[in-house]
C-alpha cells in the first residue's frame, strides 16, 4: 500500500497518462543495465549486452522494458493493493528467477530519472515526491515474497 494524498494520486495519474510506455520502458530498463551492469546477468538470454550501445539497441531489452512499465502502470490502478497486484510477479522473481530484490529499488530510481528527463519542468518536486513513494511501494510489493 502506498499512502498518497488525493493530490499526489492525481499528479501520478495525470503524468502517467502522458507516458509512452514503449519508449520510456525501454529507456528505463536499458539505463538500469548500463548503470548497474551486474543486473545484466538476469538478461543474458537477451543476446549481446556487452556494451552500453549494445544494451541501448537490444530489441529484447526494449521489449521487456515496455512489459515492465505496462505492469507498473497496472499497479498504479491498484495503489491500495500493490502486494496483491504484484504477488505473482514477486513469486516469479523470487522463486524462479532469483532476482536480488534490491534491483527493484534500483529500477524504481532509474524510472524516476527517466520520467524527470522526459517531462522536465512538468516533473516538479511534488510530482517527484509522489513518484518516489510509488516506486518504493512497488519495489516493496515485488520484494514481498522474499520476506
Swiss-Prot record:
Tell me, which GO biological process terms does this entry list? hydrogen peroxide catabolic process
Pfam families per UniProt: Globin
* Tissue specificity statement from the Swiss-Prot or TrEMBL entry: Red blood cells.
Could you say which residues bind heme b here?
Answer: 64, 93
What Gene3D superfamilies is this protein classified in? Globins
Molecular function (Gene Ontology), one example: heme binding
Disulfide bond residue pairs: none
The alphabetical list of record keywords is: Heme, Iron, Metal-binding, Oxygen transport, Transport
- Residue ranges annotated for the Globin domain, each copy included: 3-147
UniProt keyword annotation of Cytoplasm present: no
Show the GO cellular component annotation of the record: blood microparticle; haptoglobin-hemoglobin complex; hemoglobin complex
Kindly state the subunit structure of this protein: Heterotetramer of two delta chains and two alpha chains.
Q: State the family named in the UniProt similarity comment for this chain.
A: Belongs to the globin family.
Please state what the protein is called. Hemoglobin subunit delta
Q: What organism is listed for this UniProt entry?
A: Elephas maximus (Indian elephant)
Amino acid at each position: 500500500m502506498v499512502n498518497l494524498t488525493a493530490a499526489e494520486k492525481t499528479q501520478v495519474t495525470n503524468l502517467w497518462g502522458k507516458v509512452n510506455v514503449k519508449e520510456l520502458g525501454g529507456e528505463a530498463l536499458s539505463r538500469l543495465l548500463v548503470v548497474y551492469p551486474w543486473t545484466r546477468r538476469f538478461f543474458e538470454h537477451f543476446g549481446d549486452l556487452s556494451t552500453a550501445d549494445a544494451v541501448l539497441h537490444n530489441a529484447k531489452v526494449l521489449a521487456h522494458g515496455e512489459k515492465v512499465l505496462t505492469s507498473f502502470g497496472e499497479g498504479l490502478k491498484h495503489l491500495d493493493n500493490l502486494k496483491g497486484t504484484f504477488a505473482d510477479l514477486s513469486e516469479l522473481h523470487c522463486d524462479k528467477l532469483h532476482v536480488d530484490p534490491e534491483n527493484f529499488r534500483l529500477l524504481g530510481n532509474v524510472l524516476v530519472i527517466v520520467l524527470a528527463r522526459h517531462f522536465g519542468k512538468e516533473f516538479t518536486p511534488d510530482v517527484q515526491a509522489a513518484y518516489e513513494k510509488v516506486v518504493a511501494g512497488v519495489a516493496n510489493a515485488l520484494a514481498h515474497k522474499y520476506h
